């Protein structure tokens, strides 16, 4: 049972969002950033996501909890925002919001059918298989804060190269800045980066292997710039493909 969905949504957005790249990550309007989108909620929350089709977005389920209205934010060339309606929100049936709060494994994935197409370039999903080892490199792109606690630094898509640490597997992957190794503040997800795509280079092309679910500060403290927690998509690929078909969206 979801306790206080609106309050919980705010708590998740501000305490769990992976930092859309704190630590000096550079803007990334091309490459990985072309597929990243920004989402906002009526309770003051904001997250990232990734376009899988012109009319379909993948994000974290905890970004679109019941009890609020959500919009996709599209920026024009002058960085003026336009709010785009969502037609349908489909959360994975096995998602457990309390698990996200504890940084535990859960099906933290949701699909958003858009009322109208977006300009973003759809990103391909990584095929199943391909084990993840410590030190493997990934690219994360999101709209989160560049400086923790400074809301003015959010809203620009930034990308950061992070590496796997700990014991990566099919249930959860933890990423860190290879320069700081989580021991001091470095690159990583922050507020507004939840739902951001995590890319892996597969045969010279970037493909989405997971999405951001949470972040920590250095030394596993609260905050950003330490660990970036990723929900791998391999075990949910069948569900994503099935739901995309039901929603009438064609995946690349």
Model-derived regions: residue spans:
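Conserved catalytic-core segment of clan PA serine endopeptidases
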Residues: 22-31, 70-120, 127-130, 152
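Positively charged n-region of N-terminal signal peptides that target proteins for export
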Residues: 1-4
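Soluble periplasmic/extracytoplasmic beta-strand elements of cell-envelope proteins
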Residues: 38, 58, 71, 109-113, ...
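Chymotrypsin/trypsin-fold serine protease catalytic domain
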Residues: 106-109, 114-186, 226-227, 233-238
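Bacterial N-terminal signal peptides
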Residues: 7-18
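Glycine-centered low-complexity coil/loop motifs and glycine-rich tracts
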Residues: 187-191
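C-terminal subregion of chymotrypsin/trypsin-like serine protease catalytic domains
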Residues: 28-35, 41, 45-46, 51-65, ...
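Surface-exposed patches in mature extracellular/periplasmic domains of secreted proteins
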Residues: 99, 123-124, 248-252
């Amino acid at each position: 049972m979801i306790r206080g969905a609106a309050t919980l949504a705010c708590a998740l957005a501000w305490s769990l969002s992976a930092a859309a790249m704190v630590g000096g990550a550079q803007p990334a309007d091309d490459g990985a950033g072309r597929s990243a989108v920004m989402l906002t909620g009526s309770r003051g929350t904001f997250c990232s996501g990734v376009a899988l089709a012109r009319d379909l977005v993948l994000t974290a389920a905890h970004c679109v909890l019941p009890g609020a209205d959500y919009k996709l934010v599209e920026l024009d060339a002058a960085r003026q925002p336009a709010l785009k309606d969502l037609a349908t929100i489909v959360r994975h049936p096995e998602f457990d919001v309390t698990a996200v709060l504890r940084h535990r494994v859960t099906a933290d994935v949701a699909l958003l059918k858009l009322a109208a197409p977006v300009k973003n370039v759809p990103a391909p999903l990584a095929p199943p298989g391909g084990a993840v080892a410590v030190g493997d490199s990934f690219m994360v792109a999101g709209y989160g804060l560049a400086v923790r606690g400074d809301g003015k630094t959010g809203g620009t898509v930034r990308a950061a190269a992070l590496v796997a640490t700990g014991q990566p597997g099919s249930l959860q992957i933890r990423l860190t800045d290879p320069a700081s190794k989580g021991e001091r503040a470095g690159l990583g997800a922050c507020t507004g980066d939840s739902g951001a795509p995590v890319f892996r280079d597969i045969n010279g092309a970037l493909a989405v292997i997971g999405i951001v679910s949470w972040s920590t500060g250095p030394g596993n403290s609260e905050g950003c710039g330490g660990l970036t927690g990723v929900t791998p998509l391999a075990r949910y690929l069948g569900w994503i493909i099935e739901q995309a078909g039901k929603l009438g969206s064609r995946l690349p």
